Amino acid sequence: ASGNDDKIAWYINDGSGSFSTQQIISTNADNAYAVYAIDIDDDGDNDVLSASANDNKIAWYINDGNSNFSSEQVISTTADGATSVYAIDLDGDGDNDVLSASYDDHKIAWYINNGSGSFSSQQIISTTANGAWSVYAIDLDGDGDNDILSASGFDHKIAWYINDGNGNFSAEQIIGTNAYGAKCVYAIDLDGDGDNDVLSASINDHKIAWYINNGDGNFSAEQIISTTAYTATSVYAIDLDGDGDNDVLSAS
């Protein structure tokens, strides 16, 4: 996703880590901000999602199975200043629903997938994520459904929203308010105890931090990993050194 040219694109991997030139999917995502790929229409291939800030749009692009993509299929144009998009099953019906974070209206929202890629109107989860930058979903309380995480920059907040298993969400549960200019949130098991801990990147304090999950969705104070990720914008974790634990990556 690239903002200055409004572009959603992909790059073909030949299987050995060599990539093609840019393959354009769309140039109609006005100030494209985020992209994600997952099967949306339950046909076994991975479709593409985008969030674009200037047109307040969440959209998807249908993969025909041979990596040919349709024109944009608009899910919503009411995510004002859309900054983040993610998809996962939220209501327990086996298909992937869509989540958005939008900066201008401080909103975390989701869109119910009927299983074939048709979506409901916007379902608001919260309008108190002030300057919402990032949204993610994973099981945080060990009950088998996917809860929601948000990072919001105006209030420096990392928060989560409890899923009851049917796509009904609690009010925000604050994890921390010390991520100054919170820009990105992610979750994965970091301490090897089987539950998903939370990571944040914050732009104003150049910080990468994590929050220890006790297993039922109660979190520690922030544990600082670094304050030298200058203007930190993104965080992710995966095993990089083959020792079986998840290491942390940052972009600044």
Label each PLM-derived region with a short phrase.
Residues 33-42, 83-90, 133-140, 183-190, ...:
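Beta-propeller blade termini
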Residues 7-11, 57-61, 107-111, 157-161, ...:
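A short loop-to-beta-strand structural motif that recurs across blades of beta-propeller domains
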Residues 12-30, 62-80, 112-130, 162-180, ...:
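Blade-edge motifs of beta-propeller repeat domains
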Residues 1-2, 42-51, 92-101, 142-151, ...:
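Acidic/hydrophobic-patterned starts of short beta strands in beta-sheet-rich repeat architectures
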Residues 1-16, 230-232, 236-252:
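Low-complexity/repetitive intrinsically disordered segments
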